[in-house]
Regions:
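Hydrophobic packing residues within well-ordered alpha-helices of enzyme cores
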Residues: 61-65, 90, 116-117
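Domain-level recognition of soluble alpha/beta enzyme cores
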Residues: 123-153
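Short, well-ordered alpha-helical microsegments
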Residues: 58-59, 87, 113-114
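Short alpha-helix plus adjacent loop in nuclease-associated cores
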Residues: 82-94
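A polyampholytic, Gly/Pro-enriched intrinsically disordered region
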Residues: 95-105, 148-158
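Active-site-proximal alpha-helix that buttresses catalytic centers in soluble enzyme cores
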Residues: 2-82, 124-127, 164
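Non-DNA-binding regulatory cores of transcription-related proteins
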Residues: 96-105, 110-131
Length: 164
């Protein structure tokens, strides 16, 4: 069995004329990413794949997660083509992960990350900013990942973290 943690980047500011890829996290986005990192600290195992879109806001979100986990930023892998990547692109990349990894993590953008969770679980999902979906996958090799192979185990949102 494998587990996939799919995260949408934290809340970002308006573009104000800058390219969308360069948008940065707001103070709320930073705070939510740090909280999500603390929330998932006991779930994360050092060395598990952490693949991230190269957009500034996703990179910042992943760095805050690493900070909360007590991991070096070296833990994250910037996937050059992941900016606004489709669910199918994510499936291709995840399928290349080492089989020794029982779990893997991605930080990306909607609609791609929400579409990925939907494709894997056959359940409608729309991740809010700094939302996380945990997907349980019943296979031993990441290369076996395809539509319908997952079960949605949980959704975490910034609001749900406040309630607990």
């Amino acid at each position: 069995m494998k587990r996939l943690f799919v995260i949408r980047h934290g809340k970002a500011g308006l573009s104000n004329g800058m390219p969308d890829v360069a948008r940065t996290l707001t103070s709320r986005g930073v705070e939510d990413a740090l909280k999500l990192g603390l929330w998932t600290k006991t779930t994360r195992n050092a060395g598990e794949p952490l693949w991230v879109s190269p957009a500034t806001r996703t990179h910042q979100t992943a760095k805050k997660l690493c900070e909360s986990w007590g991991e070096s930023e070296d833990a994250l892998h910037l996937q050059p083509d992941a900016y606004l990547a489709s669910d199918r692109a994510w499936l291709t990349w995840i399928g290349q992960w080492p089989n020794e990894a029982a779990s893997g993590w991605i930080v990306g953008h909607n609609p791609g990350v929400s579409d990925l969770v939907e494709r894997l679980t056959d359940q409608p999902v729309w991740l809010p900013t700094c939302g996380l979906a945990e997907v349980e996958l019943h296979f031993e090799s990441w290369a076996e990942i395809f539509a319908g192979t997952g079960r949605l185990r949980g959704l975490i949102t910034p609001k749900s973290m406040l309630l607990s």
